[in-house]
């Protein structure tokens, strides 16, 4: 595990973004953990989050020209990631979409830089992949191509079939999905910290049952 990944896990736990217990998911499954990136809701939270996204991009080696944040959650994520990259001397344009088109002023449903070249999509998680598919449609309609997807957490969990939602996106569009952390790293962290020993066992059992 890299330093930025351990720091991100610790910070997510501290901010109650990553919690352990018993949670009923939309899928109906009972999960021993829950990740809610919406609780990164202060300026400092976004600062720390942006550093983790920038570190994940640097490690991934992804080749891209512009950052895109799907409305709504992806908008602040793309914005702060672009800022963190600029701090590291890697300034990239960014854009996001509106849910509704405007018929006055700045027209269209894209705000920010024009979508062109290779586009990196930044979001919090991929659950069903719907937002990512919509983003790819928007990107291609603008004449650009998706370069990959960057998310905070890869649950490494099967969907309805044998593949995870992330694997389905990778297979369908032929693009990589990069995450700051994966469930296996969360599990490693839990195992290495005695205070989380009980949670480690529950997460490991869940991963054995639903993992990919």
From Swiss-Prot:
Q: Which GO terms describe its cellular component?
A: cytoplasm
Read off the InterPro entries from this record: OPRT (IPR023031), Or_phspho_trans_dom (IPR004467), PRibTrfase_dom (IPR000836), PRTase-like (IPR029057)
Residue numbers binding 5-phospho-alpha-D-ribose 1-diphosphate: 26, 72-73, 98-99, 102, 104, 123-131
The record, for CDD domains, names:
PRTases_typeI
Domain of life according to the entry: Bacteria
The entry's keywords: Glycosyltransferase, Magnesium, Pyrimidine biosynthesis, Transferase
Metabolic or biological pathway: Pyrimidine metabolism; UMP biosynthesis via de novo pathway; UMP from orotate: step 1/2
Q: What is its EC number?
A: 2.4.2.10
| EC top class, as a word | transferase
Q: Which cofactor does it need?
A: Mg(2+)
Q: Which reaction does it catalyse?
A: orotidine 5'-phosphate + diphosphate = orotate + 5-phospho-alpha-D-ribose 1-diphosphate
Molecular function in Gene Ontology: magnesium ion binding; orotate phosphoribosyltransferase activity
Give residues annotated as binding orotate: 34-35, 127, 155
Biological process, per Gene Ontology: 'de novo' pyrimidine nucleobase biosynthetic process; 'de novo' UMP biosynthetic process; pyrimidine ribonucleoside biosynthetic process
Under PANTHER family, the record lists: OROTATE PHOSPHORIBOSYLTRANSFERASE 1-RELATED
Q: How does it assemble?
A: Homodimer.
Alphabetical list of HAMAP family matching this protein:
PyrE (MF_01208)
Q: Please give the NCBIfam families that the UniProt record associates with this protein.
A: pyrE (TIGR00336)
Q: Which family does it belong to?
A: Belongs to the purine/pyrimidine phosphoribosyltransferase family. PyrE subfamily.
Role of this protein: Catalyzes the transfer of a ribosyl phosphate group from 5-phosphoribose 1-diphosphate to orotate, leading to the formation of orotidine monophosphate (OMP).
Q: What is this protein called?
A: Orotate phosphoribosyltransferase
Lineage, opening ranks: Bacteria, Pseudomonadati, Pseudomonadota, Gammaproteobacteria, Pseudomonadales
